[in-house]
């Protein structure tokens, strides 16, 4: 109604269970999105739910159900689980981040999801997996670490929207960023060229 955006120009962002949402919607309606940013996404939700030895599985039955003991829960989770619903089709540009020390969404979930997506996607759009070696579920610690993660997400969004070619950007994504010019100033990027 307000025409803020249009089909194929949306960039969705979500982390953890929000990453689960992004994974589900990108499988169901990939043509709506220009890109997706998924931070520590819970994308292998069915496998995780079936493993009652994992620390958070049993405690999250109220939220996600118990696929191991209830067939209707299994069927429902399977219907939207991002990993289980990857199809041979075009996907938008996707940035996935994971953390090696994440004890909520183990790093192998996003890695496994990315590998399967690489095998199945039929397009040439970006599919990036960024692994933080010294971070947990909440990302890097400290102000600079949080700003760096935000900068990476926005640099990716600006890159796929075609805006990085018109500005002077130069961020080093894998290591140090010059604090994004006091939070939201201009910076430069190297990763996506």
Where are these regions (language model features)?
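Accessible peptide chain termini
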Residues: 1, 191-193
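Active-site-proximal cap/loop segments of hydrolase catalytic domains
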Residues: 1-170
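Short hydrophobic targeting helices and cationic amphipathic motifs
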Residues: 175-176, 186, 191
């Amino acid at each position: 109604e307000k025409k803020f955006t249009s089909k194929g120009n949306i960039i969705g962002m979500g982390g953890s269970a929000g990453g689960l949402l992004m994974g589900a919607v990108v499988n169901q309606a990939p043509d709506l999105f220009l890109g997706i940013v998924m931070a520590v996404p819970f994308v292998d939700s069915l496998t995780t739910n079936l493993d009652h030895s994992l620390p958070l599985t049993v405690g999250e039955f109220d939220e996600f159900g118990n696929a191991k003991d209830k067939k209707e829960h299994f069927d429902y989770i399977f219907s939207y689980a991002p990993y289980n619903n990857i199809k041979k089709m075009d996907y938008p540009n996707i940035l996935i981040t994971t953390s090696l020390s994440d004890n909520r969404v183990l790093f192998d979930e996003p890695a496994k999801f990315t590998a399967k997506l690489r095998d199945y996607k039929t397009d040439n759009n970006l599919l990036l997996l960024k692994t933080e070696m010294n971070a947990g579920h909440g990302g890097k610690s400290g102000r600079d670490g949080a700003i760096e993660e935000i900068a990476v997400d926005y640099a990716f969004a600006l890159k796929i929207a075609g805006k990085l070619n018109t500005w002077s950007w130069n961020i080093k994504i894998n290591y140090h960023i010059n604090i994004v010019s006091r939070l939201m100033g201009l910076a430069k990027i190297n990763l996506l060229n």
